[in-house]
Structure formats: structure tokens, C-alpha cells
């Protein structure tokens, strides 16, 4: 019998009590700042709804805390931090923990919060967290000795995953270096430089009532574009009910380049993704813009790589508008310069970058495959170790 099994047999053989999150921490609040309050080279972490914190020169919290993205493409993403930090007004900050090991709670939230959010949000809407929803999230509360032993086991898995992820991050940095250099306009010495307005027709996406989502025609959503440099049919999970007129008007074709239209932060505005294969009967969301090629001067994969270079990203950010959110539009994207080189040269660059892409992103081999395997192993043990029989209060 393992140490954990002995502790459970001794301390909670009949099950454990489940409690709502509001009873396990003294404070569940949000930050007060706009998402664009970050400062370059700031002294403190600034947590927004992005997966990684930015920097800022002021702090509003000095706590051991769990931070949860309240909306946006990373809704439900969880960070842990101990020390001085600041937070965006839609980022939840949880601290002053009672009866619960903060790392135990962290593992449990990572396992079950996102599913809970999707189950409790309004169908068809962009998922977001409300305070009552978070307060009512139910958590098993075994004795602290049991919690600590579970944390010890699961932390070993996450440590190994973190080491592998750090190695992959270094490889991705190298990949981005080659991407930026191979697609640098000055180094390419193009035949000529044109602009997006000369090469594409830009159109806003489809807006439908909430009840139309969930079945029907595949749809390119915000998250599909935000997370992927290029798109294939198998990557699309969302569906929407359309009539024939809408299917024709908001169609998706091979070579279409999509850009995210809004963002919580300026760094994430105008993320792009290119359709690299034919997709029959597909549409696109109003949260993205479609740039359809009007010439045959560019191949899809070249577009996929070019529009993700640092210089293009800088151009998109420079022309974007900022209020409480960052926004872009067709006329702003139209100003992006595009180098025109031969198809043969484009294919040569694509072949080089495809090899880097496979090394960094192909989950069937190398580091990505090992990270995927370790993550699945962690999730298996997390689900196994965090599953408890509920002990009723009167038992």
C-alpha cells in the first residue's frame, strides 16, 4: 500500500466533504486595470486574460494567489504567483486560502474548471466567468496531509513537463529567428513590394443568434485563428446553422487568410491563420476578418508564415486602435507591405520553415510528442488522485 493510500485509509476512508470555492478562500476578486496598462520592462507581473503575464511598474496585490482568465480566448487559464503583482479587471484573483493547500487547489482547478465554465455558460456565447459561477465551483477537501501528498506526486509530473517545455521554448525561439530572417523584406530582395489592399479583398465575418451555434456548417472561429498559423478542415471544431445565401456570402476557400479583429491586448491583435486546403461548405465568425486573394502571386503556406513575422505583427499593432480593447479592420490591414518573389522562391522558404514547424509543433515525434505523453500521464494521475467519494455532512 502506498503512503497516499495509507493516509486515505487512516484519515478519510468513507470519503471527503466537498465545499464551494467561496468557503475555501477569504477573497475572490478581480484586478482594476485595463488590459493595455502593461509597461515595457516593468517591475512586477501584470496578469491579463493572456496565458502569460506582462509587466507593470505598480502592484495592487502582495499575496500567494491563483489567477484565472475571466474571458477571451484563454478563458479559464490558470496562473499561480507568490509576491507583488497587478491584474486586469477581468482577471480573477483568489487568495487567503482556508482548509486547502493552494497547490492542491491549483491542480484541481487545472483539471476541472474549464469544463465547468463551458457547462455553465450560455450556449452559443463566447465563454466567460461570472463571480457567482466561480464562487459555486465545488472542490473536494480531504485532510491536509492527504492534500500535501497528492501535491508532492503531481508536482513531480509538472516539473518534468516544465523542463521539456523550456527546451521546446528555446527551439521555438530559434524557429522564430529563422522565420523573421528568411521573410525579411530587405533580405528577400523582392521583384516588387505590394500591399494587402493590392492582393486581397477583406470582408467581415458572420454574426448569428446564439441558438444557431452547435450544429450545421463548420465555422472558422476566433480561437482557430488565434492558435494556429494555418488551418485545415480537421482543426475546425465549431459549427453553425446557415442558409444557402449565408454559406455563399461567408464561404471559406483555400488561400484565405484570417485575422482576429479584436483583442484584450495590443500584442494579440490581428493574429493570422491561412487556410491551406480546400474545405467544402465552411464559414467564418464575425470575430475574424477574411482576406481573400485576388491574384495568384502568393502560395497559401507562404502567407501563413509571412503574416506571422515580427515585422508584420509590428505593422498590425501600429495601425490598430486602442480603447478598452484593441481592434483592427480591413482598411488598417490593407496597409501591410508584402514582398513579391517567385513561386519557386516561396516554395523553397516554405520547405525550410515546414521542417522547423514539424520539429516544434508535430505531436507525433520529438519534444512535442514527449511533452504530449507527459501531459497525458499527468492528467491520468491527476484525475485518478483527485477523484473522491463525497462524504455527506450528516455521515
Predicted regions and their residues:
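Short, conserved secondary-structure segments in the cores of folded domains
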Residues: 12, 125, 209, 246-248, ...
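Amphipathic alpha-helical segments
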Residues: 15-17, 135-176, 183, 191-192, ...
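A short beta-sheet element
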Residues: 48-52, 56-114, 122, 130, ...
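Long compositionally biased, domain-poor regions of proteins
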Residues: 81, 104, 110, 115, ...
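A short glycine-rich beta-alpha junction/loop motif
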Residues: 85-91, 123-142, 281-287, 321-342
Amino acid at each position: 500500500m502506498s503512503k497516499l493510500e495509507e493516509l486515505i485509509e487512516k484519515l478519510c476512508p468513507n470519503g471527503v466533504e466537498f465545499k464551494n470555492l467561496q468557503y475555501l478562500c477569504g477573497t475572490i476578486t478581480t484586478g482594476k486595470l485595463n488590459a493595455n496598462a502593461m509597461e515595457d520592462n516593468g517591475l512586477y507581473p501584470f496578469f491579463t486574460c493572456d496565458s502569460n503575464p506582462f509587466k507593470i511598474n505598480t502592484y495592487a496585490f502582495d499575496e500567494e494567489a491563483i489567477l484565472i482568465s475571466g474571458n477571451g480566448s484563454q478563458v479559464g487559464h490558470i496562473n499561480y504567483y507568490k509576491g507583488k503583482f497587478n491584474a486586469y479587471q477581468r482577471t480573477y484573483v483568489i487568495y487567503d486560502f482556508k482548509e486547502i493547500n493552494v497547490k492542491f487547489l491549483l491542480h484541481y482547478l487545472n483539471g476541472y474548471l474549464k469544463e465547468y465554465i463551458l457547462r455553465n455558460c450560455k450556449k452559443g456565447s463566447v465563454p466567460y466567468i461570472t463571480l457567482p459561477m466561480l464562487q459555486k465551483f465545488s472542490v473536494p477537501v480531504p485532510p491536509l496531509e492527504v492534500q500535501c501528498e497528492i501535491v508532492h506526486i503531481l508536482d513531480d509530473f509538472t516539473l518534468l513537463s516544465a523542463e521539456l517545455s523550456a527546451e521546446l521554448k528555446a527551439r521555438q525561439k530559434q524557429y522564430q529567428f529563422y522565420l523573421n530572417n528568411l521573410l525579411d523584406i530587405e533580405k528577400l530582395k523582392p521583384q516588387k513590394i505590394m500591399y494587402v489592399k493590392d492582393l486581397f479583398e477583406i470582408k467581415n465575418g458572420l454574426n448569428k443568434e446564439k441558438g444557431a451555434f452547435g450544429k450545421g456548417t463548420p465555422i472558422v472561429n476566433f480561437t482557430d485563428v488565434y492558435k494556429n498559423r494555418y488551418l485545415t478542415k480537421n482543426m475546425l471544431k465549431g459549427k453553425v446553422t446557415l442558409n444557402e445565401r449565408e454559406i455563399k456570402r461567408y464561404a471559406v476557400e483555400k488561400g484565405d487568410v484570417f485575422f482576429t479583429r479584436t483583442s484584450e491586448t495590443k500584442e494579440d491583435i490581428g493574429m493570422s491563420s491561412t487556410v491551406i486546403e480546400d474545405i467544402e461548405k465552411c464559414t467564418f465568425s464575425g470575430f475574424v476578418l477574411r482576406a481573400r486573394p485576388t491574384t495568384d502571386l502568393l502560395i497559401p503556406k507562404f502567407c501563413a508564415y509571412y503574416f506571422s513575422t515580427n515585422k508584420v505583427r509590428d505593422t498590425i499593432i501600429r495601425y490598430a486602435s486602442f480603447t478598452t480593447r484593441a481592434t483592427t479592420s480591413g482598411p488598417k490591414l490593407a496597409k501591410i507591405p508584402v514582398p513579391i518573389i517567385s513561386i519557386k522562391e516561396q516554395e523553397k522558404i516554405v520547405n525550410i520553415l515546414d521542417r522547423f514547424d514539424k520539429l516544434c509543433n508535430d505531436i507525433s515525434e520529438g519534444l512535442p510528442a514527449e511533452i504530449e505523453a507527459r501531459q497525458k500521464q499527468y492528467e491520468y494521475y491527476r484525475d485518478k488522485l483527485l477523484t473522491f467519494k463525497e462524504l455527506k455532512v450528516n455521515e
